[in-house]
Amino acid sequence: VDLRQEPPPLIIGERLNTQGSRRAKELVLANDFDGLVGLARAQVEDGAHCLDVCVATTERSDELEFMTRLVKRLSLEIDAPLVIDSTDPKVVEAAVKQIPGRPIVNSINLEGDGSRFQALAPLMAKYGLPAIAMCIGPKGMAKTAQEKLDTAQLLYDTGKKYGLQAWQFIFDVLTFTLATGEAEFADSAKNTLEGIRMLKQKFPESFTTLGLSNVSFGLPASARKVVNSVFLYHALKAGLDTVIINARDVIPYPEIDEQQKKLAEDLIFNKHTNALAELITHFEGAKAVATGSTKRIEVDPSWPADKRSYFRIVNRLKEGIEDDVVQAIADRVKGVKLVRQEGRLVLKAPTKETAHEAAVETLNEVLLPAMKEVGDKFGAGELILPFVLKSAECMKAAVAELEKYLIRQE
């Protein structure tokens, strides 16, 4: 997998991490390797390019042995690169030796005496490994944009002493929760966005990343998806290359309710002193559902079939698309009959030729333009890859139904 996705981001799945996922911790404590592999597979199906793997717990002391067994299973059964997440360099090296390809190391920093970086840098040089480089220096976590840039420069310069190349640095610019209301962190999201811009300008051959959900930690569950999704949109605009998230928890930016979008952006950009209170009041007062989408997206049965088909592809509403496509074809044919067979609409056209022509028109006038809109939104950063893949699944189902009415050319 190329670290530089076009368009970005490279998605690093965060659920296989005992420090942040209750489910992952339960599976580790239960020695449930099958369950962990299943959790990994589900993230890949949801659109993750890579998987963060952390198995450390306070309840058990066999992190090295457990990590070694797990990454061996994952390497054999999951088609996705791994991100080895451990504070113990010995665990990282043991895991690296079990993986046929090149994993990402998570993470290096220069906290304290820099001993962690000193232990891992030779390993990175030996195996040619990239690493998430946290913007943490001798003075602690970098908070202002300039501090982030200065710390990244220190990380980079230190790495060069070990022979590390620019592409081996994935700078975590750090993001802090906006839920505390503390003045110290009121501009933290703005500083993160500006830090991304500054690092991308200074280190064009390196990469940037964020543990995105940190920005909303402590907010009501119903608000977190909105804040995370809005922040991701602006981070990508700033130049973010990779992101550590649960792809399932992201809402496409155009689908976020305008009022909720404004509340989130007021908080992220610290537009006024009541931004946090207003956001919390809105989400707690409205008792918004914690499951996500802020706009109810439905197909109106009264719409013409062309519009229904187009809408389903753009908005990833696969169920029912076959009938809508058949109806769209039928609307282009005179003297057509529609019957329902085994629960599906079937077209009975006067001739195969008329059905063929109508199917081609439907493809060119409805289905292909719908996928073009999806592609345009992807290119503009309004959609991330998992949503494009779901639209592609709708397109595939639509074309499979449409092909029944095409005349095969010998």
Place the predicted regions along the sequence by residue:
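Domain-level signal for soluble alpha/beta catalytic cores
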Residues: 1-410
